[in-house]
């Protein structure tokens, strides 16, 4: 909402109450929230499911969801999807209006990248059919030279904005 952003930019917080959502806030990192149907989806690390150790869990970001109850409390954190989360980093993400398509950032797997100490980011997409997310597809699979990350759909859902370090920009990463 532009009014809320304007108020924040002008230092006017009196009409807003900041509530610590202790149901999901931890000593680890939680960020990049977005509304998805009746849930809040976000990126977090420090969770141990699928990880061999706590130190490994602290190192990787995955996608999580929590339900928003009738009093706007966040309840019951779960991984967003076993298909969308991998052994690499995931997030941030964006959904279409219908909640049937997601775009998200993931470390891409470039042959030999680990040996070269180079790991790029890619944008992946997945569609939800009959309640099940499809296997994610890399949008820019033919390009392993540059990173593509932080996707955001416009409100009409017909334009995808993202950040990249490909040539032709004005800095390291540009929209």
Where are these regions (language model features)?
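Short, conserved micro-motifs composed of acidic
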Residues: 1-175
């Amino acid at each position: 909402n532009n009014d809320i952003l304007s108020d924040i930019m002008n230092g006017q917080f009196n009409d807003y109450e900041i509530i610590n959502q202790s149901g999901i806030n931890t000593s680890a990192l939680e960020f990049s929230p977005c509304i998805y149907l009746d849930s809040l989806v976000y990126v977090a690390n420090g969770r141990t499911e699928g990880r061999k150790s706590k130190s490994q869990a602290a190192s990787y970001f995955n996608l999580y969801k929590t339900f928003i109850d009738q009093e706007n409390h966040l309840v019951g954190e779960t991984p967003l999807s076993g298909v969308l989360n991998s052994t690499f980093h995931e997030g941030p993400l964006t959904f279409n209006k219908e909640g049937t398509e997601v775009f998200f950032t993931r470390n891409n797997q470039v042959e030999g990248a680990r040996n070269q100490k180079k790991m790029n980011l890619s944008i992946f997409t997945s569609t939800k059919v009959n309640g099940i997310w499809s296997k994610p597809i890399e949008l820019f699979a033919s390009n392993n030279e540059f990173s593509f990350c932080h996707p955001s759909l416009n409100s009409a859902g017909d334009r995808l904005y993202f950040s990249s370090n490909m040539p032709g920009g004005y800095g390291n990463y540009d929209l």
